[in-house]
Amino acid sequence: MSRKRQALDPNNPTVRGLGLGALFNDLENQRRSRQATSPKTMKELKAQLQRDGEQWRDEHKKEFKNGNVKIFHPSPRSVADILEKYLYYGIIANDDEEMERGQVSFYDLDSGTYKASQRTLEKLATCIERSLTTRQLAEIRHYLFLDSHRLTETRTKWLIPVNNGIYNQHTHKLEPFSSKYVFRHKIMTNYNANATEPSFNGWQLSEWFQQIAGGDRDKLLLLWQTISAVVNPNLTTDVAIFLVDNGQGRTGKSTFERLLENLVGAGNYGSLKLKEFEDDFKLASATGKALLIGDDNNPNDYNRTSENFKSVATGENILINPKGLTPFNYRFNNFIVQSMNGIPRFSDTSDVLFRRFRVIVFDHQYKATAANKRIKDEYIKDQRLLEFVLKKALSMTPDVLQDTTESQEIIKDIKEDNDSVDHFIENYLPEMESTRVPITFLFKLFLATMDY
């Protein structure tokens, strides 16, 4: 034992002789008492804050000789100090610059995740002092911002927050939530180690996936990898999934989307189409979501820029500019799925953009029967099915999503449709027999083939 530890050891005879042993024991008992009485739920936290507020007012009241009592109210600084006694809070950031433009996040005792909800912070503050004004509430938030330390988001690939805990892919065990893990969101489906695939009047999810894949093993794998990436965005696959059909309807495309939404749960997915990624106000609504899903993108849309889309897909830092609020830095940690009846056009024709895409075609048309309607309305909402899907998804660790032949061919067509020069080179130059062609002639031929 080091000299320092020995000097502080309450069992040391010298320490006992000085009467410090009792002091150390008292401090240890206080520490254990605080741990035992610390709030375990948000309801308990609110009750504790109310008690602390009452205690502050009682300790600071002024009693006069005539029996009158004057009650003082805690200042914003005092309220912030009380909040800081109980909250695990900070700013999720990677460096000082992100700290300057970050948001105060706090550990939600009920969900096991960190939230950046100003409304919840203000509600907690009013548990201490109900008479706080809007200006004082803003002042309290500012004190919390100034006192915040840096929080590092947990991006460990094998730790996945689900509804009933944190699943460890290394140990295959469920761990309890803890403030030491900084997660912004979780999957709202329980992990059930005993989950098996249910059957609903003869319908099974695995057989449906086989129909979608049409016998293509790579496509079947991509379907399951998509679910795995939705469940665990920390895999950082750097790609987005495009679900495509030809617009005939009843292809199962929207049913697959609803399955993903049911799996992550209400409040954990956001609606954002391709064009809307470049809209500051709409992008702000997508923060804190596990899944960003865009339904029925218009194939006639022309996307002039895709910078935000690429940054979100790769988890890069973005300046978020919410309407009426202070701009802040944010790193998205989610998965993108987009649905469409045809591929929209892009002004960006670089490989940097197109290698972010994986395309899954839904070309099987289902009959409009009551039995098929139950698949979307009932079966894919069943918790037994969702727990089976989650269990299977957690057994997968795809660092790279399968690049199917189907996807490669469609991406090639997209590039040609979006890049007129590439289309010309691919379809017209091979027909030329001469190795020496005048530039003027070549340019006029290009204009003619492009219907200018």
Please report, for each region that a protein language model flagged, where it lies by residue.
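Trp- and S/T/G-rich repeat-edge/linker motifs of beta-rich repeat architectures
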Residues: 106-109, 113-128
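Feature primarily recognizes SF3-like P-loop helicase cores of small DNA viruses
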Residues: 2-102, 127-452
